[in-house]
């Protein structure tokens, strides 16, 4: 029997209610549905509303891979009146009062559930939070254990980290809302992006090895862990986003610690955290960032997913990546409408150029192929940097929307190659005509000496006669 707590009223945006109305019937028909919405759009709210409103599900299992996501989902579900228990070894130690094995909805760590089993028989609905991870063995093992369950995937980036699609598991994809719609309604803020150190990082990554679809730690370290580049990370953060809370994404733990140290030497309160940071220290550091006693937190793959600070003013991407999904998740941390009006992204990894991604644009995802095909950045570039302020702007922009500077006429690599080829043809033709004229003069001299007519001269010039002696 479903038991509900007294419900708390939530502000339901129209697209959230539309999503709930569509997803319930779609899950009944297609069984495995991938729901896509931008970071900060309220995917957890939409999933929770769906569970609270659809009555056919007697047993529900919500899976996430981080305690922050588990706590977020549990809170949303309880606020909507859903009886909810938690199954996560680490979370249970911190909040034993939230363990309720009899609750019909269990929010759990994918690792814990995979190890223990869900403690629920005949699960009717499984929710995969951050569903771009759905092809991992842990998620697949849980889905296999409940073959009759409907599966809802929630993600902002419907592809694996290597860019491949999720069509091997999900049967249909539903884009619930697009970034452009949320910017138009001021639910999200489109960030201003600045490109720094692009040429040097690009050179450092030529021929760099990859693993799992992204650069290896060693190749990233060689490209960006340099004193000059680290110093520039600090200088540009001070210049472009002074005084606002910032998160820095570093290449390695050592790289992150060096950046934090350089910030502190510049008189800016900064801290480092990584996967080995204790839960207590991590909470303390993030609380300090939230209350303003800390301005910068440097990290390595910790604050990429499942963490939000609406007051965040800037993200500094001090690492390269080949993964559009990873890049979008880093940028997504700074798109919430709360906090500073100007939201800043500083890209020190040449990522937007490499991936031809304009932060905030709508992406044409597909279920089968994941990331859309991107044009060659050298042949068909989509973006450039302002000649005055270094803000990233569209390739066709004649004026920078940030500083107003007039931009020189941009030429694509293809246009440049065409012009070079045309110039080469012109030069070759000029050389050819010069040689023909020299040959004509010599032939005319010989014809005059030998009493030959001009037809002989033309035949020599056209190559029909032996060379002129």
Which residues make up each language-model segment?
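Conserved helicase ATPase core of P-loop NTP-dependent helicases/translocases
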Residues: 91-100, 257-261, 268-300
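Conserved Walker A/P-loop ATP-binding site and its immediately adjacent core
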Residues: 57-79
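A short beta-strand element within the Helicase C-terminal
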Residues: 123-124, 296-299, 305-320, 326, ...
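Post-DEXD/H (motif II) to motif III coupling segment of the RecA-like Helicase ATP-binding lobe
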Residues: 132-193
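Walker A/P-loop
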Residues: 29-50, 249
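Conserved pre-motif I regulatory segment
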Residues: 2-36
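Conserved segment of the helicase C-terminal RecA-like domain
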Residues: 334-360
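Conserved interdomain linker/interface between the two RecA-like ATPase lobes of SF2 helicase motors
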Residues: 173-247
């Amino acid at each position: 029997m479903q038991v509900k707590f007294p419900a708390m009223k939530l502000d339901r945006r129209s697209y959230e209610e539309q999503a709930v109305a569509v997803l319930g019937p779609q899950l009944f028909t297609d069984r495995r549905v991938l729901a896509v919405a931008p970071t900060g759009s309220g995917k957890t709210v939409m999933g929770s509303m769906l569970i609270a409103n659809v009555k056919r599900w007697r047993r529900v299992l919500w899976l996430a891979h981080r305690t922050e996501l588990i706590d977020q989902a549990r809170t949303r579900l309880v606020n909507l009146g859903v009886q909810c228990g938690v199954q996560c070894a680490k979370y249970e130690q911190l909040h034993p009062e939230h363990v309720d094995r009899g609750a019909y909805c269990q929010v759990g760590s994918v690792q814990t559930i995979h190890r223990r089993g869900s403690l629920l028989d005949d699960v009717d609905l499984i929710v995969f939070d951050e569903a771009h991870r759905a092809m991992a063995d842990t998620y697949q093992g849980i889905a296999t254990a409940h073959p009759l369950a409907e599966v809802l995937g929630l993600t902002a980036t419907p592809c694996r980290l290597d860019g491949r699609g999720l069509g091997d598991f999900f049967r249909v994809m539903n884009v619930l809302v697009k970034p452009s719609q949320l910017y138009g309604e001021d639910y999200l803020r489109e960030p201003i992006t600045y490109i720094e150190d692009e040429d040097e990082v690009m050179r450092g990554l030529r021929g760099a090895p990859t693993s799992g679809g992204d650069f290896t730690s060693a190749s990233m370290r060689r490209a960006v862990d340099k004193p000059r580049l680290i110093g520039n990370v600090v200088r540009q953060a001070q210049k472009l986003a002074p005084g606002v809370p910032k998160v820095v994404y570093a290449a390695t733990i050592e790289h992150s610690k060096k950046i934090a140290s350089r910030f502190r030497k510049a008189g800016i309160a900064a801290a480092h955290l990584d996967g080995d940071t204790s839960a207590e220290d991590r909470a303390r550091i993030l609380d300090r960032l939230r209350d303003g006693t800390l301005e910068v937190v440097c990290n390595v793959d910790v604050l990429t997913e499942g963490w939000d600070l609406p007051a965040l003013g800037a993200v500094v991407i001090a690492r390269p990546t080949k993964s559009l999904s990873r890049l979008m998740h880093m940028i997504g941390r700074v798109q919430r409408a709360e906090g500073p009006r100007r939201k800043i992204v500083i890209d020190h990894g040449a990522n937007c150029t490499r991936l031809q991604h304009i932060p905030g644009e709508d992406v044409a995802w597909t279920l089968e192929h994941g990331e859309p095909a991107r044009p060659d950045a050298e042949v068909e570039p989509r973006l450039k940097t302002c000649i005055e302020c270094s803000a990233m702007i569209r390739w066709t922009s004649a004026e920078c929307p940030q500083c107003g500077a007039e931009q020189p006429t941009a030429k694509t690599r293809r246009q440049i190659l065409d012009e070079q080829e045309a110039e080469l043809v012109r030069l070759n033709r000029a050389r050819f005509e010069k040689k023909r004229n020299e040959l004509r003069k010599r032939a005319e001299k010989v014809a005059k000496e030998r009493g030959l007519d001009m037809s002989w001269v033309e035949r020599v010039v056209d190559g029909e006669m032996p060379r002129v002696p």
